[in-house]
Amino acid sequence: MNSRCASINKILPFSCVDGPGNRLAIFLQGCNLRCKNCHNPYTMGICDNCGDCIATCPQQALSLQNGVINWNADSCEQCDTCIQQCPRQSSPMTLTYTVDELIAITRKYAAFINGVTVSGGESTLQLPFLIDYFKAIKEAPDLRHLTCLIDSNGTLSLNGWQKIAPFMDGAMIDLKSWSEETHIYLTGRSNQRIKKSIKWLSEHNLLAELRLLYIPEKTDYLENIEPLSHFINSLGESITIHINAFHQHGVYGEAKNWRSANKEQIINLQNELILRKVNLIKTPNIYT
């Protein structure tokens, strides 16, 4: 038995946008970046059971029991009023799962999926749980066919990647800007460790995808197209580059006033990369 626990915000039994094929997508709670453009800002913080959200719930689905927020999923209508009021950018609707409980859920859908993707928040903040979960999948005869992917911001240390590498099939990493200055403006943290993670993962054939989020007038990919292209080309020819288009849906604060990226802008960035021999590029199917 494995009783190691993790705080989980959401589980999607079937996802076609969180890696190749049909996947079980698990979103862990907590993030160490503070991205202005985050579409899931309620996954950033950890609930401290302050109780401020209880009175805001129109369905009275929240209560405080023994100093801990209790969420009644049957009464909840997913209106998100509570998370919009949370001062910690958290959610009272998170649940705690053990490795064994999550394996049971995985087994339920195993015949219908190609693999699992653990995202967030930032999934690697709960690294011991992640290692045990992936290890359990690889050791189970009826689950070991599933690929185990991590969707990460790349801030994990190289020592951390070395610990989980034997049990994962790859990681999808976001490079939110090229320059450190722009990255700090967008996320609150430097991108130096992220670049090191990307290089290490590529060298060990574990970089499943490199993601670039284009935000008009905010990201600096085009201004730094030469060093960016050189960096991408140094990763090897088999690395998929996924250009995502920023849209305003789900964001808060100043990013709500930022312009959404359009198809012309994404194609322009794609063409500039192709001119510099970056060829394996995915672009959005839909623009908002």
Indicate where each model-derived feature is located.
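Flexible, glycine- and charge-enriched loops at secondary-structure boundaries
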Residues: C50, P92-L95, T187, N191, ...
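N-terminal [4Fe-4S]-dependent radical SAM core
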Residues: M1-I69, S75, Q84, K108-F112
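FAD-binding FR-type
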Residues: V68, D74-S75, L95-E101
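Short Fe-S-cluster ligation motifs
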Residues: Q60-N66, Q78-R88, E101-E122, T288
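Auxiliary Fe-S-binding modules of radical SAM enzymes
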Residues: M1-P20, Y214-T288
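Conserved AdoMet/S-adenosylmethionine-binding subsite of the radical SAM
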Residues: D100-N257
